[in-house]
Design a protein with these regions (language model features):
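Anionic-ligand binding patches
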Residues: 1-146
Length: 146
C-alpha cells in the first residue's frame, strides 16, 4: 500500500500477533502532490537511493511544490483491534538543497518557515516537533482511558 496508515496498521498488527501483546508502531510518509504522492511510505528506501538533487530534478518542470508529511501512530492488540492516530503537515519543496541531513531534510520547508528543515535552529525544530507530539498525546489519553 502507498498509504502510511495502512502500512503502520499492518506492521503494528503483525508485531502484536507475533509478540502476543499490544504494540505501538509509528510510520511516516512524504507525499509530493505533483509526483502522484511519491515517495509515500517508502521514505527510508528513497533516502538510501536518491539524493536531494535527484528529487529536485524530478520537480524541475513542475509548478506545484506542495508536499504532505503524514505520520501514523498505531496501537494494535493481538486480537486484531487497532487504533490509529494521524498527523498531516503541509510543506513546500525548495528549489535547491541546503544544509546537511537526509534527502528530504535538505529540501522540505515546513509551513511558516522560509528555509529547509536542515537549516532550522533547535527552537524551530522543537516548534515543529510539538505539532507531531499531538498524536502521541492522543495515544497516551486513549491508553489511560482504556
Amino acid at each position: 500500500s502507498n498509504d502510511v496508515v495502512e502500512v503502520s496498521k499492518y506492521s503494528a498488527l503483525y508485531a502484536a500477533k507475533k509478540l502476543n501483546k499490544p504494540v505501538i508502531k509509528s510510520d511516516v510518509g512524504y507525499y509530493i502532490e505533483e509526483l502522484g504522492g511519491f515517495p509515500g511510505p517508502f521514505l527510508k528506501y528513497i533516502n538510501d537511493m536518491l539524493t536531494s538533487k535527484d528529487i529536485l530534478n524530478m520537480m524541475k518542470t513542475k509548478n506545484n511544490r506542495k508536499i504532505y508529511l503524514k505520520e501514523c501512530l498505531t496501537y494494535a492488540e493481538p486480537n486484531g483491534f487497532t487504533k490509529e492516530f494521524i498527523n498531516v503537515e503541509e510543506a513546500t519543496l525548495a528549489t535547491k538543497e541546503a544544509g546537511n541531513g537526509s534527502t528530504f531534510d535538505k529540501i522540505v520547508i515546513f509551513e511558516g518557515d522560509n528555509h529547509p528543515k536542515s537549516l532550522n535552529s533547535e527552537k524551530e525544530n522543537l516548534k515543529h516537533f510539538k505539532k507531531v507530539l499531538v498524536i502521541y498525546d492522543e495515544c497516551a489519553k486513549f491508553l489511560i482511558s482504556k
